[in-house]
Amino acid sequence: MSSAFISLVKRISSQRRCLLLALGAAATMVACGIQDTSDQSMEADEPWNWSDEFVRSAVDQVRAGRDLNPDSWPGGARVAVLLSYDVDNETVQGLRTGNISIGPLSQGQYGSRVALPRVVKLMNEQGVPSTFFFPAWSLKLAPEQADLIQESGMHEIAAHGWIHELNTALDGPTEERLLRQAVDAIEEITGTRPVGYRAPSWNHSPNTLRIVRDIGFLYESSLMADDRPYELVQNGEPTGMVELPVEWILDDAPLFNPRGNSYMNPRDVMQVWIDEFDKAWEEGTMFLLTMHPHVIGHRSRIIALEGLIEHMKSRDGVWFGTHEAAARWVRKQAGMD
């Protein structure tokens, strides 16, 4: 990272710095308490006055490197299906912000009490290995979730932060301390050290990738530079870190918001996901879907997931795997091991 970039970031106020790190992520802006500053003077940090060096340094912090999509997936399959569940529960219903309210917390408990068992039952019945990303506190509050997931022996539990904290608003030492705490807590409860990481709110601070590499994760799954697996590049340096990219249209939360204006009929959502899968199958790449038990696990919504799985199973050459299995496969095929 260039000295010009570091010095300018240090001069930016805490709110503006948070805005810079969020770079348009609405959820992050709200959590940081930032108002729209488009009509305010930003003096030296006005983007149109930034130097070439600064812009390139900012953009090059974390970029997509080489394409890691293999010629084929395990068993000669043409497409990989990776189903993932961010088991946020109470953490995203108030704990992450400190805005404690009993009603929203009850929605979080629905995740562990009703929705997760419903989801795991479906995955087990369909024989679909899946990856469950936990903020550590979601697991600490209901550790029985680990037994439920691990009983079949085919699913993966991975890390999703400590308390679904806004990592982009934290200094480096705090972000690292919380993630190391999370990894240790998940290992203590599950008996297995997580090898995968998904950042809360799908965003990186300038420190996140360094921390993830230092901890020794096998893969990362928070960014959106492709819809195929790729290697992360940090400040121009190939990292050897596999990115399994995500995408908002392949996330249940923004589509099923009954209190907002983005709610979609579950059968319409199913068709969107089917179309995404069909194109991935046609291209011979990867279909990665992110869901949340407390969202997809409601009765009317899990119908969309049931229909999607039925459709995917009707096609030839489909491999269902955990994120860990996919990451290990692409590393091997790319000669990274």
Where are these regions (language model features)?
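Glycine-rich, positively charged active-site loop/lid region within alpha/beta enzyme cores that binds
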Residues: V242-G260
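Catalytic alpha-helical scaffold of carbohydrate-active enzymes acting on polysaccharides/glycoconjugates
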Residues: E43-G196, S201-L244, R267-L289, G297-D337
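N-terminal secretory signal peptides that target proteins for export/translocation
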Residues: M1-S14
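Substrate-binding clefts and catalytic carboxylate motifs of secreted carbohydrate-active enzymes
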Residues: H294
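C-terminal segment of N-terminal export signals and the immediately downstream linker at the start
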Residues: Q35-A44
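N-terminal export leaders
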Residues: R16-L20
